Regions:
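Hydrophobic transmembrane alpha-helices and their immediate loop junctions
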Residues: 1-234
Length: 234
């Protein structure tokens, strides 16, 4: 059991770190390409996970969820967390309005691309299965499946139209100015709203589970599409 837990924790941690790191790095690379070097000047245009770690969102909360689920139900059914946001100065972008839309979209876009790429990688692991240890093959396929799942969930969650999530910033960029200002004004409360919806209200209202609904009704259909796009049947 201990060995299985170690393998499961390693697969979960690596999949989550890759998804979060590349998501944040994509924002930084996009901002730099579009004229804003703020993130680059702060060392955030980087593939080094340490530069994107948030103590609570990347370490403490995911660790608590991971350990509590393994100890209570013996498996991991849900994870939640966040990285340190990449700083972007929209006024340094060559086109502040549409530049911010593209910078915000870069994070979810890289997650969708990674999900598809891991789906393709599964073919390679399967083809090499006879020359790999059985445990190694199983672990790699588990890691690939988790990577696809986490990347799709991270992308779908971040596309929710609520600042400071990417979807909210995209919405601000495409709405007419009066509506954009109203939506942008929600950003100061955005994290509190998300925490309330994901953690607080589900404990107070029976059957209220917006994160579960997002996963079931949006992320899992997208995941199935990614599997098909990667050539894993219909």
């Amino acid at each position: 059991m201990t060995g299985e837990w170690v393998g499961e924790i390693a697969a979960i941690a690596l999949a989550a770190i890759l998804a979060i790191t590349l998501h944040e790095a994509a924002h930084g690379f996009a901002a730099k390409a579009l004229g804003d070097s703020t993130a680059a000047e702060m060392g955030r245009v980087s593939l080094n996970p340490i530069r994107h770690i948030d103590l609570v969102g990347t370490i403490l909360l995911p660790a608590f969820l991971l350990v509590s689920q393994l100890l209570t139900i013996g498996r991991v059914e849900a994870m939640f967390g966040w990285a340190k946001p990449v700083p972007v100065n929209i006024w340094r972008l060559r086109n502040p309005r549409w530049g911010m839309v593209l910078v915000a979209a870069a994070g979810p876009a890289i997650n969708f691309a990674l999900a598809w790429g891991f789906g393709l990688a599964a073919h390679g692991v399967t083809a090499l299965a006879d020359s790999l240890p059985e445990d190694g093959t199983e672990w790699l396929l588990r890691f690939i499946a988790l990577s696809m799942l986490y990347n799709v969930i991270l992308a779908c969650f971040n596309l929710l139209p609520l600042p400071p999530l990417d979807g909210g910033r995209i919405l601000v960029g495409i709405l007419p100015a009066p509506l954009a200002r109203a939506v942008a004004g929600l950003e100061r409360f955005g994290l509190l709203i998300v925490i309330g919806l994901v953690f607080v209200l589900p404990h107070l209202i029976t059957g209220f589970d917006p994160l579960g609904a997002l996963i079931r009704n949006v992320a899992l259909p997208v995941l199935r599409f990614m599997f098909m796009l990667a050539g894993h049947g219909g």
